[in-house]
Amino acid sequence: MFDIQEELKKLPDKPGVYIMKDENGEIIYVGKAVVLKNRVRQYFQSLSNQTPKVRAMVAHIKEFEYIVTDTELEALILECNLIKKHRPKFNILLKDDKNYPYIKVTMNEDFPRILMTRRVEKDGAKYFGPYTSAYAVRETIDLVKKLFPVKTCSKVLPRDIGKGRPCLNYHIYQCLGPCQGNVSKEEYRFMMQDVCNFLGGRQEDIIKKLEKDMKEAADNLEFERAARIRDKINSLKHIAEKQKIISTAMEDQDVIAFAKSETDSCIQVFFIRGGKLIGREHFILEGTSDVSDSELMTAFVKQFYSSAAYVPGQIILQEDIDEMEIIEKWLSGKRGTKTYIKVPRRGEKLKLVEMVSKNALIELNQFKERIKKEAALAKEGMEKLKELLNLDRLPRRIEAYDISNTGSTEIVGSMVVFENGSPKKSDYRRFKIKSINVQNDYQSMQEVIFRRLKRAQKEMTEKDEGGGKDVGEKGAGFGTLPDVLLVDGGTGHVNAVRSVLEELDFNIPVYGMVKDDNHRTRGLVTGEREFDLSKDIVLLRFVTAIQDEAHRFALEYNRKLRAKRYSGSVLDNIEGVGPKRKKELIRHFGSVKAIKEAEPGEIAKVKGISRDLAQKIYDYFRQQE
């Protein structure tokens, strides 16, 4: 039994991070302290002086842990990492923070590539972002490919140089043709550095360089090449003209301001490079109904810059933040040179902050309006589904199932949950099919439903005995039964599931989601009839969203298992090839198939692979033939 009062006496007079947990051992809050003893004790003393949010959190605390650090800076870094990892419900959180995409330029490779990623690693690559949508990333990458002749094929270089013919892009001057050896590693990297400068808002530097190249081409009577360079210069100038000059200080700045409502907050960031606005992003924050402006801004700065790809020399804020000195020190360490945090009270910088704040308010109002519309459509969808299927009650909890496989391997099932018409991702579940190893959708679906309902029986029994969770409680999982059950498939799937429901004595309505010849949702079927959805666009979209989500979730798991089998299993069998070397091999060659076809000398070029190990890898694949 954890005795909080006794444990409070043991707290040290040192900096560190404290971790609050509830009765289920779930982390509900993470914080940092200059002196752990003083900070943690404050939560349990004079609660009347605390905010309602803090009082609510303390009521849930059943135990706490702490990690001592040598310095306050170390505590700050650890706090940021733990919040990002565990996303505790009483911390202020960026909405879906873990999913923000970045642009990655693989400057750690001989012939760098440009791609989208959701993970920032210390691997020598250059990262730009975060962006708030994958669409924005893809749009930017497409623009880069129009302006710069970067390679877009899947060839692994330098391994594939000279293998095969060049693609169409090479012939229309949209690629330099590194796969043909037409450009050296140094020349290609030089061009990719221009790409990085462009993504960083340094168009003027690129334009000056291109104007010099254009003059040189014209002097050498290479008029076609000069014309292509001229067109690229015009495109870059057009982009630069659209980037409004909003600061007379020709330096790199991030300007951050916010807008708040009773329940939500929106923070807007303007990215200013060389005095020009090169981009902006907005972020919705959860759990801000009862926090001060300073607390809100502090939490955002910590979370945003803990994963930001770039830290500018100056960060301009709307509001003072706590621990400004230590946060400045942390950001300067990430940047490599000094970063200054400023909160302007007058002048040009204050006007900048006010402009960003107005934009944050616009984004917040649009967000609230969108949420309102989505809730109304979800409610209408549930009501129409109840009416169409003649259900006894509104289907507030809908569970949908799908099966995905690669022939007779990677057979998996998905369970997605829609609660009050919206996805409840915390209740999603994945199933790896165990009872069969052949492609059989009916049996696979039966296994998934059987396992799900057996778990429900177990949890309901535990609840009756006093150990379970209530319906709707976080972590309730399988103990919460659906109002309606939807499966991807037709009458055969419905009948297969009904036999399981009867066997386990559950009375849950079940329907199959069927598609037309174009693989689009058409209707719902029972064993006896089909309900046509085409006449009601709201209901059709509602069911389509559920079916698509079930399919996406199943396919995602199938691909994950398939990738693991292809990229991991063979290399794992080779002595001396651990996780790091395996990662380097895949990064260099692109696939296990390419490693298998490589000669020992080529394998030995991979970082961390000796000549002896390269020979061992080569011999292993020869023995498997």
From Swiss-Prot:
Q: Which GO terms describe its molecular function?
A: DNA binding; excinuclease ABC activity
Residues of the GIY-YIG domain: 13-92
* The organism's place on the tree of life at top rank: Bacteria
Q: Which UniProt keywords apply?
A: Cytoplasm, DNA damage, DNA excision, DNA repair, Excision nuclease, SOS response
List the GO cellular component terms.
cytoplasm; excinuclease repair complex
Q: Which residues are in the UVR domain?
A: 204-239
Q: One Pfam match, by short name?
A: GIY-YIG
**Localization in the cell:** Cytoplasm
- Using the UniProt record, give the first listed, main subcellular location: cytoplasm
InterPro entries listed in its UniProt record:
GIY-YIG_endonuc (IPR000305), GIY-YIG_endonuc_sf (IPR035901), GIY-YIG_UvrC_Cho (IPR047296), Hlx-hairpin-Hlx_DNA-bd_motif (IPR003583), RuvA_2-like (IPR010994), UVR_dom (IPR001943), UVR_dom_sf (IPR036876), UvrABC_protein_C (IPR050066)
Q: Which GO terms describe its biological process?
A: nucleotide-excision repair; SOS response
Q: Which NCBIfam families match?
A: PRK00558.1-5, uvrC
Instruction: Describe, as the record does, how this protein assembles with itself and its partners.
Output: Interacts with UvrB in an incision complex.
PANTHER family linked: UVRABC SYSTEM PROTEIN C, UVRC/OXIDOREDUCTASE
**Family stated for the protein in its record:** Belongs to the UvrC family.
Task: Provide the function of this protein.
Answer: The UvrABC repair system catalyzes the recognition and processing of DNA lesions. UvrC both incises the 5' and 3' sides of the lesion. The N-terminal half is responsible for the 3' incision and the C-terminal half is responsible for the 5' incision.
- What name is this protein filed under? UvrABC system protein C
